[in-house]
C-alpha cells in the first residue's frame, strides 16, 4: 500500500512544511539540520500521504519557543504530524519510531502535540502515554522496547 518512509532533504522539507497544519509558524529553514532535526514522509504513486517532523533535543519542549531554543540531544521530539490518507499518520509515527530506534542512540521518544482531543486520541490509540499536560500542548511518550540478542 505505502512505500517505506523517506527522509526529506532541505528543499523538499521546505516544500512539504509549507502545508504544515499543526505548526505553520515554525521557520521552514529551521526544520532540517543533519542529525538534529529531520522531516520524514510517506508517499504512494508520487503523492504525499503523511509527514512527520522530528527534533532531537536536550529537553522536552512545552511550546514552540522552547522547541526553537533547545539544543541537540538524545530526546526525539515529534512536534508535527499530518496526513492526507487514512491510516498513514499512524504508519509514519510507528515506522519512524522503528527507524529512529535502529539509527540513533536516543533513549526517549516524546511528542509536543496540540492540546486537542484529536491529538489525545491519536497518540493514546497508537500506544503513547500522556507524560504531561501544558497550557497549550500535551507531551506524550512512546515507550520503546529494545530487543537484545
Where are these regions (language model features)?
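Short amphipathic alpha-helix that is part of the acyltransferase structural core
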Residues: 1-31, 41
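A short helix-loop-beta-strand connector motif used in the catalytic cores of GNAT acetyltransferases and
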Residues: 29-50, 55-58
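Conserved acyl-donor/pantetheine-binding loop and adjacent beta-alpha core of acyl/acetyltransferases
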Residues: 51-76
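Conserved acetyl-CoA-binding loop-helix of GNAT-fold acetyltransferases
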Residues: 83-102, 125
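Conserved beta-strand-loop-alpha-helix junction that forms the acyl-donor binding cleft
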Residues: 110-121, 136-139
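Short, aromatic/basic amphipathic alpha-helical patches
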Residues: 121-129
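Conserved catalytic-core motifs of GNAT/GCN5-like acyltransferases
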Residues: 129-143
Amino acid at each position: 500500500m505505502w512505500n517505506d518512509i523517506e527522509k526529506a532533504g532541505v528543499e523538499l522539507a521546505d516544500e512539504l512544511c509549507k502545508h504544515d497544519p499543526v505548526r505553520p509558524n515554525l521557520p521552514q529553514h529551521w526544520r532540517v539540520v543533519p542529525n538534529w532535526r529531520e522531516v520524514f514522509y510517506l508517499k504512494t504513486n508520487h503523492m504525499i500521504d503523511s509527514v512527520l517532523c522530528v527534533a532531537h533535543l536536550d529537553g522536552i519542549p512545552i511550546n514552540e519557543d522552547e522547541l526553537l531554543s533547545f539544543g541537540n540531544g538524545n530526546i526525539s521530539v515529534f512536534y508535527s504530524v499530518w496526513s492526507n490518507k487514512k491510516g498513514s499518520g499512524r504508519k509514519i509515527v510507528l515506522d519512524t519510531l522503528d527507524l529512529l530506534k535502529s539509527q540513533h542512540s536516543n533513549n526517549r521518544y516524546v511528542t509536543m502535540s496540540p492540546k486537542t482531543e484529536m491529538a489525545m486520541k491519536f497518540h493514546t490509540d497508537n500506544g503513547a502515554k500522556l507524560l504531561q499536560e501544558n497550557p497549550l500542548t500535551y507531551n506524550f511518550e512512546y515507550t520503546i522496547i529494545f530487543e537484545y540478542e
